[in-house]
From Swiss-Prot:
GO BP term (any one): Nebenkern assembly
Dynamin-type G domain ranges (all copies): 83-364
Tissue expression: Specifically expressed in male germ cells, in spermatocytes and early spermatids. Not expressed in other tissues.
Function recorded in the entry: Essential transmembrane GTPase, which mediates mitochondrial fusion during spermatogenesis. In early spermatocytes, fusion of mitochondria give rise to two organelles named Nebenkern and constitutes an important step in mitochondria morphology, which is balanced between fusion and fission. Essential for fertility.
Family, per entry: Belongs to the TRAFAC class dynamin-like GTPase superfamily. Dynamin/Fzo/YdjA family. Mitofusin subfamily.
Name of the protein this chain belongs to: Transmembrane GTPase fzo
Transmembrane segments: 576-588, 592-614
Molecular function as annotated in GO: GTP binding; GTPase activity
Keywords, ordered alphabetically: Coiled coil, Developmental protein, Differentiation, GTP-binding, Hydrolase, Membrane, Mitochondrion, Mitochondrion outer membrane, Nucleotide-binding, Spermatogenesis, Transmembrane, Transmembrane helix
Subcellular location per the Swiss-Prot or TrEMBL entry: Mitochondrion outer membrane
Length: 718
C-alpha cells in the first residue's frame, strides 16, 4: 500500500511539474507565433508602402527606394530565421556519462543509442519534423532521408557504419510522439568532449547557439580536467550561459556506500558550485549555482516513464522527483532564455526598422506631400487669378479690336471715297489725255482697238492707285493690330489686299464717239453750248454691269463724215444750215448788202479754218474728251457701290483676324484651364496619398504597439 501511495504521489508530482514546464515552453510557441504574425504584417506593410512609392511619381526617390527595399529584404530574412528559430539544449560530457540516456528520458522513449562505453559517434540533433514529413534521419547538407531505424547504425560508435564525430545527424520525429518536441525544442547530443580535441569548430557551429547547456557528469567520479576546460571555453565565448549540471547514475553511486551517500553528494555539490561560481563565473552566488545542480538517474527516469518500473522504491522516487525538478527548471530557464536570445534581437530589429521607416520615410514623405499640396494650391490660386485677369484682358482687347475695326471701316469708307473721287476728277482726264497710240478714225475697227487699249491702260492705273492709296495702308494697319494683340503674322495677312477690278471696257461698252465735223458757230453747236452739254450719241440699251466685273461687248462704230460730199450734204440737210439760210434772209432785209457780205466772209473764213483744223489729232482729242466725260459720269455713279465693296472685303478680313484672335485667346484660356484641372487632379491624388501615408503611419504605430505588448508579455516579465 505504501508503494502504491508513493507511486500515486510520484505521478501527481510528475503531472504538476510537467504542467508547469509545459506552460513555460508553450509561451515560446505562442511568442513565436505572435512574432511571426507581426513580421508577416510588417512585411506586408513594407510591401504596400513600396508599391505606393513606386506608383507615385512625386515620391520617387532612388535612395529612399533602396532603403525601403533593404528594410523589406531584412524583414524577409528575419522572418525566415524566425520560422527556423527553436529552443535549443546542448548536452556535454565525457563519453559514457549518460548524455544520450538523459535525452531519451526527456523524450520518454529510447531513441538515441545508449549503452556502456563510447556510444554516440557524432552530433545528433533531435527535433520535430515538418507537418508534411515522415519521421527520418538525415545527414546535414545531404538530401537522402533514411528511416529512423538507421539511427542505431549511423550514431552508434559500436556500429561499423558509424558517422565521423564531426558529422551532424538530424533526427526528425513527429511532434505528437513527444511533448517536448511539440514546443519547438531541439535536443543536441554530442560525441563526448574527451573523444577528440579537434571538435572545437564543430562545437562552435552546432552548439554555441544553444539556449541551455547541460553538463552530464558521472556521479561515480568527479569533474575531469577536460570537462572543466571545455566549459571554460564556453563561458569565455558566451556571456553568462545557462549551465545545468546533472550528476547522472546517482543510483549507482549512492548504492556503493549508502552510509556515505550524503557526504558524497555534498562533495559533488561543493565541487560543482566551485566550478559554476569561482571558475566559470556564470552564477553570482552559491545559492544560484546550487539550484542548477541535480543528482539523477536518467535510466531510472526512462524506465519509469516507459513503464518498465511500475513500483519504484522511495529512493528511486526521490531521484525521479529530482529529475522532474531538473526537467521543470531547465524548461523554465530554456523558455526564458530562448525568448530573450531568439526573439529579443528580432524584436529590437523590428522596432528599429519601424523607427527608421517612420523617421526617414513616412514622416518626411508626409511633410513633402503636404508641402507639395500647399504649393500646388498656391499655384492653382495663381492660375485662377490669371484666368480672371485673362478674361478681363480678353474683354478689353475685344472692345479695343471692335473700336479699331470701326476706325478702319470708317477710314476705308472715307479714304476709298476720296481716292475714287480724286481718280474720277483728276486722274482719268490726265491719264486719258496722256495716252498715246496711233489713232485712225477712218478705220472703225482700229478705233475699237484704240478704245480697248485705252481701257486697259486706265484699268492698270486706277487699280494701282487704289492699291497704293488704300489697300497697302489698310494692310499695314491690320498687321500693326495683329502685332499689338500678339497674333502670329500669317501669310494670308501679308498677302491680303483689296480686290478692285475696274474693267473700263465694260463701263464703256456702249460708248459711240461722234467724230463728225461740227462748225462751232452753227446753230446746233451754239444751242448745245448754251445748254452746256454736247450730245454724245449712245445706244439706247445699256448693258447692265455685274458686281466686281462687267460684260464684255464690241464697241459701237464712231460717227464720222464718210467724204466731203457727204459732209456738205449733211450741212445742207442739217438743222444748222436751214437756220443759217433763214438768218441770212433776215439779215439781208435788215442790213445792207455790204455788211451781210462782210459777215458772211468772216463766218466763211472761220468755217474754212475750223474745217482745216479738223485733223486726226483734233478728232483724237475729241474722242478722248467724249470718252473721259462719259467714263467720269458712269464711275461717279458707282462710287458708293465700290466703297461698299471695299468695306465688305475689309469686314471679311477683319472677321478672320478676330476669329484668329479669339481662337488664340481661347487656346490660352483652355491651356490655363487644363493646367488648373491638372493641378486640381494632382492635389486630389496627393491628398489621397497623404491620407494613405497617414494610415501607414498609424499602422506603423499599431505595429510598434504590438511589439511593445509582445515585449511586455514575453520578455520583460521573464
Amino acid at each position: 500500500m505504501a508503494e502504491s501511495d508513493s507511486g500515486e504521489s510520484t505521478s501527481s508530482v510528475s503531472s504538476f511539474i510537467s504542467s508547469s514546464s509545459s506552460s513555460r515552453l508553450s509561451e515560446f510557441v505562442d511568442a513565436k507565433t505572435e512574432l511571426q504574425d507581426i513580421y508577416h504584417d510588417l512585411s506586408n506593410y513594407l510591401s504596400n508602402f513600396l508599391t505606393i512609392l513606386e506608383e507615385t511619381v512625386l515620391l520617387k526617390d532612388r535612395q529612399m527606394l533602396e532603403h525601403l527595399c533593404a528594410f523589406s529584404s531584412r524583414v524577409e530574412a528575419i522572418a525566415k530565421v524566425l520560422s527556423r528559430d527553436r529552443m535549443k539544449v546542448a548536452f556535454f560530457g565525457r563519453t559514457s556519462n549518460g548524455k544520450s540516456a538523459v535525452i531519451n528520458a526527456l523524450l520518454h522513449e529510447k531513441i538515441l543509442p545508449s549503452a556502456m562505453g563510447h556510444t554516440t559517434s557524432c552530433f545528433c540533433q533531435v527535433q520535430a519534423n515538418g507537418s508534411n514529413e515522415t519521421e527520418h534521419v538525415k545527414v546535414e547538407q545531404e538530401d537522402e532521408h533514411m528511416e529512423l531505424s538507421a539511427l542505431s547504425q549511423l550514431a552508434s560508435a559500436h556500429s561499423p557504419g558509424a558517422l565521423k564525430p564531426s558529422t551532424l545527424l538530424q533526427v526528425n520525429m513527429a511532434k505528437n510522439r513527444c511533448s517536448i518536441l511539440d514546443y519547438d525544442v531541439v535536443l543536441m547530443d554530442t560525441p563526448g568532449v574527451d573523444v577528440t580535441a579537434q571538435l572545437d569548430d564543430c562545437l562552435d557551429s552546432y552548439c554555441m547557439d544553444a539556449d541551455v547547456f547541460i553538463l552530464v557528469l558521472n556521479a561515480e567520479s568527479t569533474v575531469s580536467r577536460v570537462e572543466r576546460q571545455f566549459f571554460k571555453d564556453v563561458a569565455s565565448k558566451l556571456s553568462r550561459p545557462n549551465l545545468f549540471i546533472l550528476n547522472n547514475r546517482w543510483d549507482k553511486a549512492s548504492s556503493l556506500e549508502p552510509e556515505m551517500e550524503q557526504k558524497v553528494k555534498d562533495q559533488h555539490m561543493e565541487r560543482c558550485v566551485n566550478l559554476l561560481v569561482d571558475e566559470l563565473g556564470v552564477y553570482s552566488t552559491a545559492q544560484e549555482a546550487w539550484e542548477r545542480i541535480y543528482h539523477v538517474s536518467a535510466l531510472e527516469a526512462l524506465h519509469i516513464r516507459n513503464g518498465q518500473i511500475t513500483n519504484p522504491s522511495g529512493q528511486t522516487q526521490q531521484r525521479y522527483q529530482e529529475f522532474l525538478r531538473f526537467e521543470n527548471d531547465f524548461s523554465n530557464c530554456l523558455a526564458v532564455s530562448a525568448l530573450k536570445t531568439k526573439f529579443g534581437p528580432h524584436l529590437l530589429s523590428a522596432q528599429k526598422i519601424l523607427n527608421q521607416l517612420k523617421s526617414t520615410l513616412i514622416c518626411p514623405f508626409i511633410e513633402k506631400v503636404s508641402r507639395l499640396i500647399d504649393e500646388n494650391k498656391e499655384r492653382r490660386a495663381n492660375l485662377n487669378a490669371e484666368i480672371e485677369d485673362w478674361l478681363i484682358l480678353m474683354q478689353e482687347d475685344r472692345e479695343a479690336l471692335q473700336y479699331c475695326f470701326e476706325e478702319l471701316t470708317e477710314m476705308t469708307q472715307r479714304v476709298g471715297r476720296c481716292v475714287l473721287n480724286d481718280q474720277i476728277k483728276t486722274l482719268i482726264p490726265s491719264s486719258v489725255l496722256s495716252f498715246s497710240q496711233p489713232f485712225h478714225p477712218e478705220f472703225p475697227a482700229q478705233i475699237g482697238q484704240y478704245q480697248r487699249s485705252l481701257c486697259a491702260h486706265l484699268d492698270k492705273l486706277l487699280e494701282d492707285r487704289v492699291l497704293q492709296c488704300l489697300s497697302i495702308p489698310l494692310q499695314r494697319k491690320i498687321l500693326d493690330i495683329e502685332k499689338e494683340i500678339g497674333l502670329p503674322i500669317a501669310e494670308n495677312s501679308c498677302d491680303w489686299q483689296l480686290i478692285y477690278g475696274l474693267d473700263c471696257q465694260s463701263y464703256m461698252s456702249d460708248f459711240q464717239p461722234d467724230l463728225r465735223f461740227r462748225f462751232s458757230l452753227g446753230f446746233t453747236a451754239l444751242w448745245h453750248r448754251l445748254e452746256g452739254n454736247l450730245p454724245l450719241h449712245a445706244s439706247p440699251f445699256r448693258i447692265q454691269k455685274l458686281q466686281n466685273g462687267h460684260k464684255k461687248c464690241s464697241p459701237l462704230p464712231p460717227l464720222v463724215n464718210g467724204n466731203h460730199w457727204q459732209m456738205l450734204e449733211s450741212l445742207v440737210k442739217s438743222k444748222g444750215s436751214l437756220g443759217t439760210v433763214l438768218l441770212s434772209a433776215m439779215a439781208i432785209r435788215s442790213f445792207n448788202w455790204p455788211i451781210v457780205l462782210i459777215l458772211g466772209g468772216l463766218v466763211g473764213s472761220f468755217y474754212i479754218y475750223e474745217y482745216a483744223a479738223w485733223t486726226t489729232a483734233a478728232q483724237e482729242r475729241s474722242f478722248k474728251s467724249q470718252y473721259a466725260r462719259l467714263l467720269q459720269q458712269r464711275l461717279r455713279s458707282d462710287v458708293q457701290q465700290t466703297v461698299s465693296g471695299f468695306e465688305l472685303q475689309l469686314r471679311q478680313h477683319l472677321a478672320t483676324v478676330r476669329n484668329c484672335w479669339e481662337a488664340q485667346s481661347n487656346e490660352t484660356l483652355n491651356d490655363l484651364n487644363v493646367r488648373t484641372a491638372e493641378l486640381t487632379k494632382q492635389i486630389q491624388s496627393m491628398e489621397v496619398l497623404q491620407l494613405s501615408l497617414k494610415k501607414f503611419r498609424d499602422k506603423g504605430q499599431l505595429l510598434a504597439s504590438r511589439l511593445g505588448d509582445f515585449q511586455e508579455t514575453y520578455l520583460t516579465k521573464s
